[in-house]
Amino acid sequence: MDAAEGSIVIKAPVAAVYKRWLAFEDYPKFITAIKHVRKLDENHFSASLAFNGKQHKATLEMMLRVPERRLAWRTLADHRAPDHLAAGVVSFASLSDQSTCVTLKLTSSFGGAVSRRIGTYLQNFKALIEDEAPKEDQL
């Protein structure tokens, strides 16, 4: 199992950052290994992933939601890929009215070198959030 943890400070209020992370269908915009996400129900999602030259499909289960604080999820065992398991936790800490620390922890058996990619995922998420924020001259 490959495991990694990383943190980043985002210039946005915790409520906005948390809400954006809940937009599961947008994960491919910042987690480059995820190619497509489809919501199945309130707590389950189908995901298509690609890394190491291979395509993978997984069903993700949201296990924990603490509004504006924490989310946790895992992949469910599947007959197509019984040995491919992953889990993640993302925590949100308000540093000020306009600043949030995001900490992401990922564990994966997919062999995608999560430890090398976690920083990129967080940087991509930060860019997504901060690029969407209204600029002062737009207010």
Q: What do the predicted segments below correspond to?
A:
Residues 59-64, 72-132, 136-139:
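Beta-strand/loop substructures that line and gate deep hydrophobic ligand-binding cavities in soluble
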Residues 7-11, 38, 48-50, 61-63, ...:
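Generic structural detector for well-ordered beta-strands
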Residues 35-36, 48, 76-78:
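Short, solvent-exposed loop/turn elements at beta->coil junctions and helix N-caps
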Residues 21, 47, 73-75:
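Tryptophan-centric aromatic hotspots in well-structured domains and transmembrane helices
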Residues 50-54, 82:
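Short strand-coil-strand connectors
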Residues 1-44, 124, 128:
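Hydrophobic ligand-binding cavity/cleft-lining segments
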